Amino acid sequence: MTCQPVMDCPVTLVIKAPNQKYDDQTINCFLDWTVEKLKSHLSKVYPSKPSAKDQRLVYSGKLLLDHLLLKDVLRKQDEYHMVHLVCASRTPPSSPKASKSSKSMGTSSSGRSSSSGSANPGSTSQDTSSTYPDPRPGESIRHRHTPLMYNNLVHSHPYSYLRQEYALNPPPGQEAPSIFPAYSAFTPLQMMWWQQLYARQYYIYSQATASNQSTSNGENAQPVPRPVTNSENPPPNPPRAPPNVAPEINPNIQMNAQGGPVMNEEDINRDWLDWIYTVSRAAILLSIVYFYSSFSRFVMVMGALILVYMHQAGWFPLLQDEGQQHPGDNAAEVNPDLVNNNDPQELERRMDDGLQEVHNNDAGVNVVARQGVLASAWSFITTFFTSLIPEGPPQGVN
């Protein structure tokens, strides 16, 4: 069915309530209606019969004003238009006296029930429902929180029983406090926040006190009395213990804090771009040597670079520290000296050996100096050539 004028075609509106108390209502209207006329129509056909002044209509996240026409607001390509109906509350909040009297009635009834020793669940539920009534159907979600509900929230807090216990059973020597006022300078949510802050500060203070007591107990510990020895017969001196020779520490050890196998990050991060960069550097170096020298020199330089690289990789260890000894051998040599330290003949023999070593050291000074010059020259040459070759990733030592 097609309509000749657009204004005469009915439009279908789906009215949704935010509090979900009523099902979605489908209403037919016309595009030439204003929002005010639609509100008056809803006050007649909607189940809760809300007044036009209390209605708020929201379409596509926008509040519809009363003077707007539906043809200027609704999208023409949609078949159904979803409109949200929000009703403002006209009920004034309850007075503080009523809430205070209801609280006193609740405390007196709870005192009577505790003194009798038997509680009725059915009556408790009825009292709760009568003390905290449900919101009326015409109210929306944002206006359903009454002062009584916030008061119930405060009394349901875990720390609220401390105040009730202090009010019912005061400490000896003190009078029972007066009834707590129903309304204070702070809101119920602020009171809850202050209670949580106080509990946390009290916990921190108790922890600090306990740690200080444990520290003072450790400092005030009595020293262990020493056994009394006879001055006439002193005990013999015990033999000195051999020095603890610590094993040699490898400075290249890699640690893994995660507890898994040791993995070198440089080996993992060497992608194809890194390899291309390394190969390009080597190619530039070799091209310079090849174009600016003869073929024989190029072969000699290539061979030298390969040998230096293999030596750096650890395939040809040319220089070995022959003077290094195992720590166990030094410990084995130290122990006989400690054992024979009190022998006078052994002391004389060691003095004679020391004189002979002085003469031998004077004769070997020149040899050591000559070896130092050769070692320095070899170190300079190897360092120069190895600096021309790009270094590879360090080998992980487990």
Curated annotation (Swiss-Prot):
Localization terms from the record: Membrane
Matches recorded under SUPFAM superfamilies: Ubiquitin-like
Keywords: Membrane, Transmembrane, Transmembrane helix, Unfolded protein response
Transmembrane segments annotated in the record for this chain: 298-318
Region (Disordered): 90-143, 212-247
Gene name per UniProt: herpud2
Organism: Xenopus laevis
Entry membrane topology: Single-pass membrane protein
Domain Ubiquitin-like: 11-90
Compositional bias annotation for Pro residues: 233-245
One GO BP annotation of this record: endoplasmic reticulum unfolded protein response
Protein name as catalogued: Homocysteine-responsive endoplasmic reticulum-resident ubiquitin-like domain member 2 protein
Function: Could be involved in the unfolded protein response (UPR) pathway.
Any one Pfam family match given in the protein's UniProt record, by short name: ubiquitin
Comp. bias (Low complexity): 96-125
Primary location recorded for the protein, binned into one broad class: membrane
GO CC term, one of those recorded: membrane
